Amino acid sequence: MEQFECITVEEAYQKLRQGAAVLVDIRDPQSYAMGHAPQAFHLTNDTLGAFMRKHGFDTAVMVMCYHGNSSKGAAQYLLQQGYDAVYSIDGGFEAWHRRFPANVANGA
């Protein structure tokens, strides 16, 4: 994959359920703690190294932000680091929360 792909929250949900990709949330710590998609790894500058050690470059990565804008830059960055398949989630957490209100976890 030479460029990241934009996907819907429904597509992201299916990939997550199938174990076909991991999900990272790049929002600020307070927003993440107030609610995030289950199984979402809170990806920050401080946690990037741990994420990369845990998930090899052959891992498909889905990036979630607030509204689906910031995730595009993060997705491009992950591609540049060497990840083979990276997706940006259209609508971000706002769309996820609207579509899957029962699938929101709280806490850090």
Swiss-Prot record:
Domain called Rhodanese: residue spans: 17-105
GO biological process: glycerol metabolic process
Membership in a protein family: Belongs to the GlpE family.
GO cellular component: cytoplasm
Gene that this sequence comes from: glpE
Class in the EC hierarchy, top level: transferase
Record-given protein name: Thiosulfate sulfurtransferase GlpE
InterPro entries, per the entry: GlpE_sulfurtransferase, Rhodanese-like_dom, Rhodanese-like_dom_sf, Thiosulf_sulfurTrfase
Pfam families: Rhodanese
Purpose: Transferase that catalyzes the transfer of sulfur from thiosulfate to thiophilic acceptors such as cyanide or dithiols. May function in a CysM-independent thiosulfate assimilation pathway by catalyzing the conversion of thiosulfate to sulfite, which can then be used for L-cysteine biosynthesis.
Active site per UniProt: C65 (cysteine persulfide intermediate)
Keyword vocabulary terms for this entry: Cytoplasm, Transferase
UniProt source species: Salmonella agona (strain SL483)
Broad class of where this protein is predominantly found: cytoplasm
Record's subcellular location: Cytoplasm
Reactions listed under catalytic activity: thiosulfate + hydrogen cyanide = thiocyanate + sulfite + 2 H(+); thiosulfate + [thioredoxin]-dithiol = [thioredoxin]-disulfide + hydrogen sulfide + sulfite + 2 H(+)
GO molecular function: thiosulfate-cyanide sulfurtransferase activity
EC nos: 2.8.1.1
Entries under SUPFAM superfamilies matching the protein: Rhodanese/Cell cycle control phosphatase
